[in-house]
Amino acid sequence: MEWMSLHVLSWVLLIISWLWIRNIAPTREHRIRATQIGASATLLVGSFWWLYEYLQYKHESKLGMRFAQTIESRHGVITVDTSNAVYGNGAYDGVIGTQLKPKSWLVRPYFLSAVRDRIENVLVIGVASGSWTQILVNHPQVKKVTAIELSHGYLDLIRSRPEVASLLTNPKLELVIDDGRRWLRQHPDAKFDAIVMNTTHHWREFASALLSREFLTEVKAHLPPDGIALWNCTESPRAARTGMEVFAHTLMVMNHCLASNAPLEPNRDRWQKILADYRIDGQPVIAADQIEATLDFLTEEALPEPGHMSRWCRREAMQAAWGDAEIITDDNLGHEYP
């Protein structure tokens, strides 16, 4: 019944139930009572119109507040607010958009070219709004992106958004509806120059399945010696520490851990060249007069901290700050089981 929203389904069931009760009611008094019950149920179902907004914003919700888009599927509910922020089952998934600007959080997927000369084959685990996958599939050097997404509801979202709609028809994209960890286990010989995961919040259920030592070890097995992995630690010291346990070389880029078994050294000239050549749907991803200011992100070398996240740091700073943090494993469930 994924073609029918919860709101519409509630109305259909209400009408069917009311007609059935009216039909079996033996007396006029019973029919009046059924009508009264139906009227009360109508008011209740009518309140569903703002149900998701209320669940999302709770005491901050206001009468008439509406999401710009709501998509329901067997995997849950995807909502988009009027600022293009996307929420999956109530948790923030990011903002729809691909344009890079100075101080933008989108520096993270673009940062791959700051540390590697050539990236041709990329794996994305978790497509969500499609913004990062759109960025990566349009990378000037990339020849193929394999993208794994568990919820096909996000495909409906991508189709409806002009910023990312062309992703689904890009010949460089192979889109797979599956669980990312399962897909890796079933394709042991697959190798990628980069594996990218804008991982969900570390405290959400099942998050440890994408942050644990065992999972990152699986990721490492799908990289060549100089391959790189990038995943969101969502400001969890334990998630960052776990990455340091698995990989010999790490950087922290805002709230993302960038890791490899080969040295990672950002290069401004290399990054500048790639950004200058970058196009999505035929348009530059960044204005020419903003490239230098964006590259100045490389001068912000310090440990990223809440309130000061537009930074990056080397492994030594990560070790000093989080070296004593407990690692996340499949057994201890990380932050899911404090």
Where in this protein do the model-derived segments appear?
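Membrane-embedded alpha-helical segments of integral membrane proteins
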Residues: 1-24
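Charge-rich, low-complexity amphipathic helices
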Residues: 17-22, 158, 167, 217, ...
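Soluble small-group transferase modules, centered on the S-adenosyl donor enzyme superfamily
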Residues: 21-123, 179-186, 249-338
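The AdoMet/dcAdoMet-binding core of the Class I SAM-like
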Residues: 98-240, 245, 250-251
